[in-house]
Swiss-Prot record:
Belongs to the CMC4 family. The keyword Cytoplasm does not apply. Its main location: mitochondrion. The twin Cx9C motifs are involved in the recognition by the mitochondrial MIA40-ERV1 disulfide relay system and the subsequent transfer of disulfide bonds by dithiol/disulfide exchange reactions to the newly imported protein. Keywords: Disulfide bond, Mitochondrion, Repeat. It is found in: Mitochondrion intermembrane space. It comes from Saccharomyces cerevisiae (strain ATCC 204508 / S288c) (Baker's yeast). It holds the Pfam family CMC4. This is Cx9C motif-containing protein 4, mitochondrial. A motif (Cx9C motif 1) lies at residues 5-15.
Length: 73
């Protein structure tokens, strides 16, 4: 898998385009990306990288702000 979480990242782009870039209307797909990225880092280590995922430290902050846990779906 060359770009983990690419499907989720593309879903965000599609959602933002269809909602005139109102990110509040795309919260669910943004959450799905963060959950996917969390699983990616848990499975592959925090030194792994995907162009679709924020760095682990930023991801942890974003998940905390959104009250998400890695097991959410």
């Amino acid at each position: 898998m060359s770009n983990p979480c690419q499907k989720e990242a593309c879903a965000i782009q599609d959602c933002l385009l269809s909602h005139q870039y109102d990110d509040a209307k795309c919260a669910k797909v943004i959450d799905q990306l963060y959950i996917c990225c969390s699983k990616f880092y848990n499975d592959n280590g925090k030194d792994s990288r995907s162009p679709c995922c924020p760095l682990p430290s930023l991801l942890e902050l974003k998940m905390k702000q959104r009250k998400l846990t890695p097991g959410d779906s």
